[in-house]
């Protein structure tokens, strides 16, 4: 009998720990979008005088606009994508 009580307790404790019993009330933190670095103004991001263009020189909103319009995005630590 003690074994059954112990197993029931452990099973209910495991369900609570996994969040199966109390599904409401807990919300996860909202993940933040990846940070942008500033690309250079002008046309699409690409080579400049034969050298790759670094991400510098314009505002955050301009960088985001360039990313959405041209599909060429620059992320901190990752370089260009798109």
UniProtKB/Swiss-Prot annotation:
Keyword rRNA processing: no
The name this protein goes by in its record: Penaeidin-3i
PTM-bearing positions, type Pyrrolidone carboxylic acid: 20
GO biological process entries: defense response to bacterium; defense response to fungus; killing of cells of another organism
Organism of this sequence: Penaeus vannamei
Signal peptide: 1-19
Disulphide bonds in the chain: 55-73, 67-74
The protein's role, per its UniProt record: Antibacterial and antifungal activity. Presents chitin-binding activity.
InterPro entries associated with the record: Penaeidin
A GO molecular function held by the record: chitin binding
Family to which this protein belongs: Belongs to the penaeidin family.
Sequence positions bearing Serine amide: 81
GO CC terms: cytoplasm
Keyword list, A-Z: Amidation, Antibiotic, Antimicrobial, Chitin-binding, Disulfide bond, Fungicide, Pyrrolidone carboxylic acid, Signal
Annotated compartments: Cytoplasmic granule
């Amino acid at each position: 009998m003690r074994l059954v009580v112990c197993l029931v307790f452990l099973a209910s404790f495991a369900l609570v720990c996994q969040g199966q019993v109390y599904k409401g009330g807990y919300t996860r933190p909202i993940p933040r979008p990846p940070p942008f670095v500033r690309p250079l103004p002008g046309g699409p991001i690409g080579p400049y005088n034969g050298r790759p263009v670094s991400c510098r020189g314009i505002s955050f909103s301009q960088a985001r606009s360039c990313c959405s319009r041209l599909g060429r995005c620059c992320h901190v630590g990752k370089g260009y994508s798109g």
